[in-house]
UniProtKB/Swiss-Prot annotation:
It is found in: Nucleus. Residues 517-602 are annotated as: SAW. The keyword Signal does not apply. Residues 268-354 are annotated as: VHIID. Residues 11-58, 106-140 are annotated as: Disordered. This is Protein SHORT-ROOT 2. The gene is SHR2. One of its GO terms (biological process) is asymmetric cell division. Does not interact with SCR1. The lineage of its organism: Eukaryota, Viridiplantae, Streptophyta, Embryophyta, Tracheophyta. Residues 31-44, 108-125 have a biased composition (Low complexity). Disulfide bonds: none annotated. Residues 45-58 have a biased composition (Basic residues). One of its GO terms (cellular component) is nucleus.
């Protein structure tokens, strides 16, 4: 989930941009649009491994009729996934001809690979599995298991398609609140968990039987169960054949062919129009940032008036360090709020956004230039003095030199805010150290928005084989729970036929392949729970700042614009089992299951 848009990562390979270790030479990355731009002619320079593009303008108040590509007051757009617009023919190329391995190559099914992509519904009872093999994995005809040297006893498959799915509960908020998976009663969860346990237990006969059954039932064009079965089956196959990174590159290449700025923009806008998944975090974070600035301005003004000798100066500039993956779609609502809620002169807003890229690219720079120009025009329309800068950073976010970003422009008159929307999970290593480095910036407020899932797995060399297998089953089950909820929300929010929905679902497929088949050191799917992030923030010296009633009302008003099933829940009850630390902030819940966490923190 690697989330939809990495602030311009139109390509799937953002999965590898946040890998815990650099990809080997045989796993090249492709960078996507993410450059910088505004209205004035751009100047660029290089510092370390960052590329800067800076644009600014003074306070204009003309009524330009050029609008930013934002719709409505939800604030969102772009969520955690990667976007590309794909036509059915292109999708067949992505998941069809080049990947006909499920039935034809390894499972001796009577079906063709074309049937795998059919949209037929699941049968009311389980299909009859193929006859079990008489010997071990060395038997011919199933080379998939030959290298594993498995021994497998006779196993009867008896699955209850009417019961609850055997998905382990999350150790985070979902578990703490007793939330059940949204896919309760669905057949895919039970079959997939049985298969994951068989893979972890090296029971190759059961794996073969279950994968055959899943292959007969799965379809990327069916209902939620069929789609989940299709994506997780592809991930399991890639894991068993140790072809995860290669499969991921193939899927990314297919999606890249159909990716463009316009298609990604359309997907982002449609996603925020039909789902509060990203607007929820945007509205909550913007409210916390604005209130923090207004409080600082009011306190500074009061101190200045009470003592003529006071050195306290109310801030007149707001500088935001934006570590997010939302194509800057968060900021139009903040610009509008600054223009309408500031009692005195409208403050100057500066945004420095960090764009993670595998390598500097002209395409990335062009896209960010376009985004900057649109933001600039919208700021002029709102009458807000504004400057925008993008920093293209290659490598792990933990390696970013925050001191070199020059965030203190304006000195004492500037208030600094740090915005982390689906960004902290992109830190592959040294997460505690990175959060501590944010504390050293002495910001007025830090906003953290992350998806609620416990997908962090231990490194293979840091655990015993048994622990690694147990961790795989745990992460698999948690991933199944999380992606089931996400897919279910898409199913009920989008029309049946939608290019934007197809794009989001294909991104889910890539995220699942990454999670299931790639080594932990290379996977970009490293989400943690709210309680875990809260523990890190407290350890770094931050204290939670509760959302005000005004912000909570704004969020509730936002949710009322969407279909039933969405709600906001207090995150105070969620705890980290390992440390006993309570979370803070609020959850966006889909059918009572927490899926997105938003919080605000102060030094």
């Amino acid at each position: 989930m690697d989330t939809l848009f990495r602030l311009v990562s139109l390509h799937h390979h953002h999965h590898h941009q946040h890998a815990a270790s650099p990809s080997p030479p045989d796993q090249p990355h492709k960078s996507y649009p993410s450059s910088r731009g505004s209205t004035s002619s751009p100047s660029s320079h290089h510092t370390h491994n960052h590329t800067y593009y800076h644009h600014s303008h003074s306070h204009y108040n003309n009524n330009s009729n050029t609008n930013y590509y934002y719709q409505g007051g939800g604030g969102g757009g772009g969520g955690y996934y990667y976007a590309e617009e794909q036509q059915p023919a292109a999708y067949l190329e992505e998941c069809g001809n080049g990947h006909q391995f499920y039935m034809d190559e390894d499972f001796s099914s009577s079906s063709s690979s074309r049937q795998f992509h059919s949209g037929t519904g699941a049968p009311s009872s389980a299909p009859v599995p193929p006859p079990p093999s008489a010997t071990t994995s060395s038997a011919g005809g199933h080379g998939l298991f030959e290298a594993a040297d498995f021994s497998f006893p006779q196993v009867d498959i008896s699955l209850d398609f009417g019961g609850s799915p055997a998905v382990p509960s999350s150790s985070g908020a979902g578990a703490g609140a007793g939330a059940a998976p949204s896919s309760s009663g669905r057949w895919a969860a039970q079959l997939l968990m049985e298969c994951a346990r068989a893979v972890a237990g090296r029971d190759s006969q059961r794996v073969q039987q279950l994968m055959w059954m899943l292959n007969e039932l799965a379809s990327p064009y069916g209902d939620v169960d069929q789609k989940l079965a299709s994506y997780f089956l592809q991930g399991l196959f890639a894991r068993l054949t140790t072809s995860g990174p290669r499969t991921l590159r193939t899927l990314a290449t297919a999606s890249d062919r159909n990716a463009s700025f316009d298609s990604t923009r359309r997907t982002a806008l449609k996603f925020q129009e039909l789902s509060p998944w990203t607007p929820f975090g945007h509205v909550a974070a913007n409210g916390a940032i604005l209130e923090s600035f207004l409080e600082a301005a009011a306190a500074g003004a009061a101190a200045s008036s009470s003592s003529s000798s006071s050195s306290s100066t109310p801030p007149t500039r707001l500088h935001i360090l934006d570590l997010s993956n939302t194509f800057c779609t968060q900021w139009p609502t903040l610009l509008e709020a600054l223009a309408t809620r500031s009692s005195d002169d409208t403050p100057h807003l500066s945004i420095t956004t960090v764009v993670p890229t595998a390598a500097p690219s002209a395409a990335a720079q062009r896209v960010m230039r376009e985004i900057g120009q649109r933001l600039e025009k919208f700021a002029r329309l709102m009458g807000v003095p504004f400057s925008f800068r993008a920093v293209h950073h290659s490598g792990d976010l933990a390696d970013l030199d925050l001191a070199a970003l020059d965030l203190r422009e304006g000195g004492a008159t500037a208030a600094l805010a740090v915005n982390c929307v689906n960004a902290l999970r992109g830190v592959a290593r040294g997460r505690d150290a990175f959060v501590a480095s944010l504390r050293r910036l002495e910001p007025r407020v830090v906003t953290v928005v992350e998806e609620e899932a416990d997908l962090a797995a231990p490194e293979a060399d840091a655990s015993s084989e048994a622990d690694t297998d147990a961790a795989f089953v745990k992460v698999f089950g948690e991933g199944l729970r999380f992606f089931s909820a996400y897919m279910d929300s898409l199913e009920e929010s989008f029309p049946k036929t939608s290019n934007e929905r197809l794009s989001l679902e294909r991104a889910v497929g890539r995220a699942i392949v990454d999670l299931v088949s790639c080594p932990a050191s290379q996977s970009a799917e490293r989400r943690e729970t709210a309680a875990s992030w809260a523990r890190r923030m407290r350890s770094a010296g931050f204290s939670p700042a509760a959302f005000s009633e005004d912000v909570a009302d704004d969020v509730r008003s936002l949710l009322r614009r969407y279909k039933e099933g969405w709600s906001m829940r207090d995150a105070g009850g969620a705890t980290d089992d390992a440390a006993g630390a309570a979370a803070a902030g609020a959850f966006l819940a889909w059918k009572e299951q927490p899926v997105v966490w938003a919080s605000a923190w102060k030094p």
